[in-house]
Structure formats: structure tokens, C-alpha cells
């Protein structure tokens, strides 16, 4: 046995040696010990998070036979990668770093006071508590500009009275405040509804609970009336977050000079300079995401390099040299990073710059990979949760990818114009040398663009669920334009201190405002051109392709949990249909992300049941994000202003809305059959809910009946005229605004094997609905309320139809003959 282990260890060591040689040969850099330690620490944090996220995982860890192979291979891969990058690293050192990162993450995250407090709260209903604490950071105002809609801030809790396990203290809490925003450092006491931060209820929905959990926030408090809160003490007038926010606001206002009437241009410029994301950018953000240029919104090392280069040039003109120049430039860059919020990319650039600077002062040039590893290791020690944040992963992954792929790609591109290697260099012609000199910067730029695209490809696939080939070309244009934007922006900001003297009416300063105006105006012109390039590139066919999540099967039907509204996605393997799209909020946060996650970029038809804003409010947003071949709506008159506006838009586009009535068949074939059962042509009804489309989707595995918010009027007509067409396996129903729905005769005619009550927020508290659900459950029917199970997915299996609730519930409906 010992001989076999020694032989296996020898083989593994040989493989690792050959892997080291391969990495060094293709990338041109030697293995770096600090990068290896950073990767080993990363593995330790991942292991701690996985083991203690669920108690069942601890049992798997103790009982190795039940240990999941996938997680074991994942941790082992990180361990071997760390050892691969470190030449001559003792196994004991790697083990110490692994164990240290493991224990550090357990102490800071898994066993934190905030985690313990959140676990003491009930999972369903909030708890009314009396909270005392200090406001941390600057409160974030909510709502549209100029309209007071409360704020959101983080509170360092000093006491919580009324929680199930007694008073709690010493953790952060997210507070939703309704009223005038408090100041940073204010000590407050208020009564609020305290609960765990809600997680997603639909596939691919943003996981707010996980996001705030990585920030050390596990619970939230809803303050309905801020007037009843008590301010125990006011914060100091000098607070670091407040000063940073004020400085950032002053500098952003300085960039507004000359751009007062161009709000979107100024917002984009402020975002590129300081990472300030205004409301006006939401309209154009999708263009940048679809072209792979969303990095322009983040403050990165490019900003700091540009600022440092400009400041160094100015100081050299003033006669500064040596370490004094380097120190001044570094301090100014650090202050700029602090003013921008010190994001992950800014922190990485500062740490790497500090290591490079110290290396120069002690005559020990720093290696790129080693410096990157040191920066990652320091970031992990400072906050172990940093490794789970997208900003950290993208920042370090991009630099690592450029270091790994940049030189090989540049060599391949440069070889396109390089003469044959067999020809001696003295024999090269002058025109060949000129071509090489001209082509070299082009090759470097193309290598940077292609290397960046390759580096972020895993995040594009697994996070954004899309591939953007157009990004390799667009970045060749927009990055130089952004470079000019930053240069003009920093030139304008360098004039800010002198421009302040204008208020004192000093001679020779007044013309400076004209210079700043021209700089900002020129910058705004370039920003507009950049926006035009990005918008045009987003419309290039196949420049952006939705591919869906690689390891997740697309459901055959999906009932979204969209609050008061409704939305159902149908898929027969060849084409997809969408029944309603929810409100504008849910369309943006639920429907579009899910369709992108499943790779559904085109739908055969969008069928709108009625004019309720909760069912069709997001139609404009959906139309801009997804290709819709046809839109279908009831032939009855609809008074919804949102619908009328969209109907006119379709007419202008040359693809008008198709009216449908009872008896129309929208999809027919061997795979699926989609039929309209209600309303009949000429029906007169006052309420929109009485004119809802009722549709039945039938396939080889079963059928789905969608009645939206139909009431007694629709059910009576269907029983009289279309009773034989009602029988379905799954019934997706809402709740009528004021009328009775779900009568016994109607349920018996459908003979459903599963009922999904899609309405869960506004009207579900009605005693009649509660009693209806309880009565049919007692009768033996499966009735799922989306308040309890969230979204519902249906998958065709060999033995029948598998219905899965996103939060809970799971059942298999055996196949039965269809009529």
C-alpha cells in the first residue's frame, strides 16, 4: 500500500512539473508563490462556506463516503492550482494558509452575530421589534428624482428588543425608512417589522439575501412611519462617508458645467469618472451589457493610471523628480480611489501599485502575477466574503487573463505581418519594418480586447447567460474613446481648485470657466459619439447571443411568481409562447432574467389576457429586450393607456397586434396545440377581469389551462359553451377583482390534478380565497399557492409531468389519455 501511494505521489508530482512548464511556456511568466497562496486561501474560504452553509454538508464532510464528488473535485482543483503556481512551496505552508482561511471565514461569516440573529427569526412572518442603533454610511434615497419615497441605509444595531431569543446586539441590519432621511452617525430608536432578507422566488431572479449576506447583513427592518422614530443623538458633522459623498457631488457638479441640459451625457460621464450610477442611465445600460462594454461604468485601474500619468507629467513640468514625485502621485491616486468608493477594482489597483512602488524603492522589481496574488491575499484577509463578489472576481480574473493570454494572442496577431522566420532580419525591407511598427500597437490593442473577452467569458456564460462576440470589435473603438474621456475629465477636474477662486473675483481667473466649459463640452461630444457606437453595435445581428445557463434544463412550462399579475412561459421544444408579462417591475426583475437564463431570446407570440397593468405593464420593456414575432390580444375593446400606446407602436413598426376571440387556434401541430376558449366576439363587460382571455395549451404530456383573473361571468359562459374543452392537468388561476371565481362546477369540469393560484400579494389575504384553498385541499386536490411555493416549473419525464415549486413542493403527474 505504501509503495502504491509513493508511486501515485511521484506520478502526480511529474504531472504538476509538466503543467508548470506548459503554463510558463504559453504565458511567459514564472510561477508566483503569492498567487499560489491566494488560490489556496480561496479554496479554504470556499470549503468553509460550503461546509457550514448547511448542517447536512458537515455530516457529508465527516462521513467521507457521503462526500459529494463535485465539491471534492472543486476544492482539490483549487489546491492543486495553488501548488502548481508555487515552486518549492512546503505543503505545511499551503495547509496552514488553507486552514487559516477556513477558520477566518467561519468566525467572520458562518458564526457571526448577524447570522445567529437571523436564524432566530421566523421564516414566514416578520416580528415587531424595538431597534436601537447607529446609521452607517450615507442613506440611499429611493424613488424618482424630486419625489420623496424614503431611503435605505445600514444600521449598526446596539439593541433589539422583542426578538424571539431576547435582546440582540453587535451586528448590521438593513433599514427601509419611510420619511426624511437621517444623517450618517445618527443614533436612532424605532419600532419596525424585522425579518430575514427575502430570497428569490423565481429562477434567475436577483438573490438579494445572498448579496447582503456577503456584505455582513442578514436581516432587514421595515419602518412604516419615520415620524415615530426617536433620534437619540446626532452624528458628528465630520464623518468620512459624508465627506466622501460631498466631495464626489462637488466634482460631479463641476463636470456638469457646459452640460446643464444634457442629463444623460453628464450621468454617463460621472459614471465613467466616479462610478456614480444615475437614474437616467437605466435606459442605456442594456446597450452596454449587450455589447460587453459594461466595464465602462466601473472605476478601474485605467482611471487611476490615466490620473497618475497626467499628474506625473504636470509635476515633471514643475521640476519634481524621484521618490517625491512618485509619492505625491500615489497619494493623489489613493484619494481619488477613496472618493470613488474604493471598489474591488480600485482596491486591487491600489494594492498592486503600492507593491510595485515599494519594489522600485528597494530595487526589487515586482512581478505582475506575484503582485496580483499579494493583492488578492490581502483582500481575502481583510474580508473573506470578497471572493464571492462579482467585482472582485471580474477585477482579478480580468488581470490574470490578460497576463495569461495577452502575450500569446499578441504574438499570433503580430505574426500576420512579420516576414518568414527563415529570412534574416538584416534582409528585411524598409517597408516591412514600417509595417511592423504600424501594426505593433494595433496587435497590442487587439490582444488586449481579445484577451479581456476570453477572460470574462466564464462570467458572461454563467452569470449573464450570454456571449457577446461584438465586444472584441467594439472595445477597440470605445476604450480609446473612454481614454480620451478620462483625459479631458481629469483635465477639467485639475482646474476645479483654481475655478473656486472665481467667486473671489480675482483677476485672470474668470476666463478659466470658459476653458472648463469647452473641456466638458468636448467631453460630452465624445460621450455622445461613444453612446452612438455602443447603441449601433447592440443592433448588429448575432453580436449578442443568449445561450442560457449551461447546466439547467429549460422547463416545458413556467408559471412566474409576479405578485398581483401573471406570466406563464410555454415551450414545446421548437418555439416558446409567453402568456402575459407582469408589471414593469416584475418584467424587469423576473421575466426577462429568466428568459435570458433559459436562452429564450425569441418567442413565437406574446398573448395578453387583459388590460390590467399587473399583467401587461412590462410590455414595452419586454419588447425592447426580446424579439417578439407576434402580439395577440382580445378583440374586445381595452381602455388601458399602456396597451393603447403599445398598440400604436406596433402599428408604426408595421407589425400590428392580432385580435383573437374564442375558437381561435394559435398554435397547432404534432407537438402542441394552443386554443383560445374565451371571450366570445361581441361580449359586453364593464370590468377588464370579465374580458380576460382563457387559453388551453395541450401537448403530448398533458395540458395547461390559464384563466388569468377571470370570474363567475367567464366561468358560466365556458360551462355552457366549452365544457368539453376545459379538462386539463394543470390549472393556473388568478383572483377576480370583485367577483366570485372557482365555483364547484367549474373545478369539476376541469378535473385538474394540480391547481396553481398565481395571485399571492394584494388579494390573497381575502378570507374567501383562504377558505377556497383549504376546502379543495381537504377534498384531495393539489392546490399550490405561489405565496408558499414561488414559481412553478413543469418538466416532461418518462413517467409523466414533473411539477416543481421554486421554494418548495414537488409532484409527478402520471400521463393520462387526452381528448
Q: How should these model regions be labeled?
A:
Residues 2-119, 128, 230, 314-320, ...:
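Transmembrane helix-bundle segments that form internal channels/tunnels in multi-pass membrane proteins
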Amino acid at each position: 500500500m505504501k509503495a502504491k501511494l509513493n508511486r501515485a505521489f511521484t506520478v502526480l508530482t511529474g504531472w504538476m512539473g509538466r503543467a508548470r512548464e506548459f503554463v510558463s511556456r504559453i504565458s511567459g511568466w514564472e510561477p508566483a508563490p503569492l498567487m499560489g497562496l491566494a488560490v489556496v486561501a480561496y479554496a479554504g474560504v470556499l470549503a468553509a462556506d460550503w461546509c457550514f452553509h448547511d448542517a447536512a454538508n458537515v455530516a457529508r464532510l465527516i462521513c467521507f463516503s457521503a462526500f459529494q464528488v463535485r465539491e471534492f473535485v472543486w476544492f482539490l482543483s483549487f489546491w492543486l492550482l495553488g501548488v502548481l503556481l508555487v515552486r518549492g512551496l512546503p505543503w505545511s505552508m499551503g495547509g496552514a494558509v488553507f486552514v487559516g482561511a477556513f477558520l477566518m471565514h467561519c468566525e467572520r461569516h458562518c458564526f457571526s452575530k448577524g447570522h445567529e440573529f437571523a436564524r432566530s427569526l421566523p421564516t414566514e412572518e416578520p416580528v415587531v421589534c424595538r431597534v436601537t442603533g447607529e446609521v452607517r454610511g450615507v442613506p440611499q434615497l429611493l424613488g424618482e428624482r424630486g419625489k420623496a419615497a424614503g431611503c435605505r441605509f445600514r444600521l449598526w444595531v446596539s439593541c433589539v428588543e422583542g426578538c424571539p431569543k431576547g435582546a440582540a446586539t453587535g451586528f448590521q441590519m438593513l433599514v427601509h425608512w419611510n420619511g426624511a432621511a437621517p444623517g450618517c452617525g445618527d443614533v436612532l430608536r424605532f419600532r419596525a417589522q424585522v425579518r430575514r432578507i427575502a430570497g428569490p422566488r423565481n429562477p434567475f431572479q436577483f438573490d438579494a439575501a445572498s448579496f447582503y449576506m456577503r456584505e455582513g447583513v442578514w436581516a432587514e427592518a421595515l419602518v412604516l412611519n419615520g415620524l415615530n422614530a426617536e433620534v437619540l443623538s446626532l452624528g458628528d458633522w465630520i464623518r468620512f462617508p459624508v465627506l466622501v459623498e460631498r466631495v464626489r457631488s462637488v466634482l460631479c457638479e463641476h463636470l456638469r458645467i457646459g452640460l446643464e441640459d444634457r442629463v444623460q451625457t453628464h450621468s454617463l460621464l460621472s459614471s465613467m469618472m466616479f462610478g456614480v450610477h444615475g437614474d437616467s442611465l437605466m435606459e442605456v445600460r442594456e446597450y452596454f451589457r449587450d455589447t460587453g462594454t459594461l466595464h465602462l461604468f466601473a472605476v478601474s485601474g485605467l482611471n487611476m493610471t490615466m490620473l497618475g500619468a497626467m499628474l506625473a507629467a504636470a509635476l515633471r513640468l514643475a521640476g519634481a523628480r524621484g521618490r517625491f514625485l512618485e509619492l505625491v502621485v500615489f497619494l493623489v491616486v489613493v484619494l481619488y480611489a477613496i472618493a470613488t468608493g474604493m471598489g474591488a477594482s480600485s482596491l486591487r489597483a491600489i494594492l498592486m501599485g503600492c507593491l510595485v512602488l515599494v519594489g522600485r524603492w528597494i530595487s526589487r522589481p515586482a512581478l505582475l502575477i506575484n503582485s496580483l496574488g499579494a493583492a488578492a491575499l490581502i483582500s481575502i484577509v481583510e474580508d473573506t466574503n470578497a471572493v464571492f463578489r462579482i467585482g472582485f472576481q471580474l477585477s482579478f480574473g480580468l488581470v490574470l487573463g490578460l497576463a495569461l493570454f495577452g502575450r500569446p494572442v499578441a504574438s499570433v496577431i503580430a505574426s500576420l505581418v512579420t516576414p518568414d522566420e527563415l529570412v534574416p532580419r538584416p534582409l528585411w525591407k524598409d517597408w516591412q519594418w514600417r509595417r511592423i511598427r504600424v501594426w505593433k500597437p494595433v496587435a497590442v490593442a487587439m490582444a488586449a480586447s481579445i484577451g479581456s473577452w476570453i477572460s470574462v467569458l466564464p462570467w458572461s456564460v454563467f452569470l449573464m447567460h450570454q456571449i457577446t462576440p461584438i465586444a472584441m470589435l467594439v472595445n477597440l473603438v470605445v476604450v480609446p474613446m473612454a481614454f480620451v474621456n478620462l483625459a479631458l475629465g481629469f483635465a477639467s477636474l485639475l482646474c476645479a481648485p483654481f475655478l473656486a477662486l472665481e467667486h473671489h473675483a480675482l483677476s485672470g481667473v474668470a476666463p478659466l470657466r470658459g476653458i472648463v466649459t469647452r473641456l466638458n463640452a468636448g467631453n460630452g461630444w465624445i460621450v455622445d459619439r461613444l453612446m452612438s457606437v455602443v447603441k449601433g453595435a447592440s443592433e448588429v445581428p448575432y453580436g449578442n447571443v443568449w445561450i442560457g445557463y449551461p447546466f439547467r434544463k429549460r422547463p416545458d412550462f413556467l408559471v412566474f411568481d409576479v405578485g398581483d399579475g401573471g406570466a406563464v412561459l410555454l415551450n414545446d421544444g421548437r418555439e416558446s409562447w409567453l402568456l402575459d408579462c407582469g408589471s414593469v417591475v416584475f418584467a424587469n426583475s423576473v421575466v426577462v432574467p429568466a428568459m435570458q437564463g433559459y436562452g429564450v431570446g425569441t418567442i413565437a407570440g406574446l398573448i395578453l389576457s387583459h388590460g390590467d397593468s399587473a399583467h401587461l405593464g412590462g410590455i414595452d420593456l419586454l419588447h425592447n429586450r426580446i424579439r417578439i414575432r407576434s402580439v395577440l390580444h382580445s378583440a374586445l375593446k381595452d381602455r388601458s393607456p399602456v396597451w393603447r400606446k403599445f398598440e400604436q407602436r406596433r402599428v408604426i413598426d408595421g407589425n400590428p397586434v392580432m385580435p383573437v376571440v374564442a375558437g381561435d387556434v394559435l398554435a397547432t401541430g404534432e407537438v402542441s396545440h394552443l386554443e383560445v376558449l374565451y371571450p366570445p366576439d361581441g361580449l359586453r363587460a364593464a370590468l377588464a377581469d370579465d374580458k380576460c382571455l382563457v387559453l388551453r395549451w395541450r401537448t403530448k404530456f398533458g395540458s395547461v389551462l390559464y384563466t388569468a383573473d377571470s370570474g363567475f361571468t367567464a366561468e358560466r359562459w365556458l360551462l355552457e359553451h366549452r365544457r368539453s374543452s376545459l379538462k386539463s392537468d394543470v390549472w393556473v388561476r388568478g383572483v377576480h377583482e370583485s367577483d366570485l371565481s372557482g365555483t364547484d362546477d367549474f373545478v369539476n369540469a376541469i378535473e385538474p390534478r394540480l391547481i396553481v393560484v398565481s395571485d399571492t400579494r394584494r388579494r390573497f389575504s381575502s378570507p374567501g380565497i383562504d377558505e377556497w384553498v383549504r376546502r379543495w385541499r381537504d377534498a384531495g386536490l393539489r392546490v399550490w399557492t405561489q405565496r408558499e411555493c414561488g414559481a412553478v416549473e413543469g418538466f416532461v419525464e418518462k413517467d409523466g409531468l414533473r411539477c416543481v415549486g421554486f421554494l418548495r413542493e414537488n409532484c409527478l403527474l402520471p400521463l393520462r389519455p387526452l381528448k
